């Protein structure tokens, strides 16, 4: 049985036999997790724990990049520094180094411990700026909710009492802050009575009932630290927020 083979079929066989070279696209950013930046007392001074950060950075290491320090939320009761790496990678694609830092929660240590941890992370990044291709003069801080509070405090609180631990020869100052729905005045939460407030995240952070100790609570709030010397702020907050009131 004879069959006529058309020219188009011959060319089809020819192209099917050709080897097509496809180069894999190089990633635009890299991720390194679990970098220990400090050690701190935990469980009220009875143990020691490593504080770690995750780093997302552009693949091109031929120049220095501005750095965004990310602080996750969790009502100071829990936190997961790696929870948001997927969308934080967008910043690395735009030319930022992103460092997501760990801090002690309120069941491990009370204020100012979490702020001291964040500032220790900032100092560590400055101390290792060359290693991580960071421009030490362009470090900003960003965080959500409880992390937004720590973002405000990291940008505003300059008293040396908040800088403890290693790398003290480096500054923990930041050049910009972007808090997302941050608690800024603990007295402004709508608790009906002191007994209800005793178990609030703010009271657990301070180790004191913020309704019974309003002056001490205010002394730990970002509104008490605002000055003309503060770096630029971009505050992001939804008007219908029922967890952190918009008035904060």
List where the protein language model places each region.
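Alpha/beta-hydrolase superfamily serine-hydrolase fold, recognizing
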Residues: 1-248
């Amino acid at each position: 049985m004879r069959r006529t083979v058309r020219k188009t079929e011959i060319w089809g066989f020819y192209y099917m036999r050709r080897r097509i070279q496809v180069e894999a696209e190089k990633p635009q950013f890299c991720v390194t997790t679990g970098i220990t930046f400090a050690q701190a007392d935990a469980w009220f001074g009875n143990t020691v724990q490593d504080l770690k950060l995750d780093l997302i950075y552009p693949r091109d290491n031929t120049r220095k990049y501005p750095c965004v320090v990310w602080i996750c939320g969790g009502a100071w009761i829990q936190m997961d520094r790696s929870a948001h790496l997927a969308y934080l990678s967008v910043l690395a694609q735009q030319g930022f180094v992103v460092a997501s830092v760990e801090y002690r929660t309120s069941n491990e240590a009370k204020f100012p411990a979490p702020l001291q941890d964040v500032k220790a992370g900032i100092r560590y990044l400055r101390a290792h700026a060359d290693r991580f291709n960071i421009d030490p003069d362009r470090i900003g801080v960003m965080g959500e909710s409880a992390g937004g509070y720590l973002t405000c405090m990291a940008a505003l609180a300059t008293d040396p009492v908040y800088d403890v631990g290693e790398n003290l020869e480096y500054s923990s100052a930041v050049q910009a802050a972007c808090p997302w729905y941050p608690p800024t005045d603990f007295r402004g939460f709508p608790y009906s009575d002191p007994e209800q407030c005793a178990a609030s995240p703010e009271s657990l952070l301070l180790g004191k009932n913020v309704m019974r100790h309003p002056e001490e609570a205010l002394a730990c709030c970002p509104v008490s630290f605002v000055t003309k010397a503060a770096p630029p702020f971009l505050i992001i907050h939804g008007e219908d927020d029922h967890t952190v009131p918009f008035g904060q």
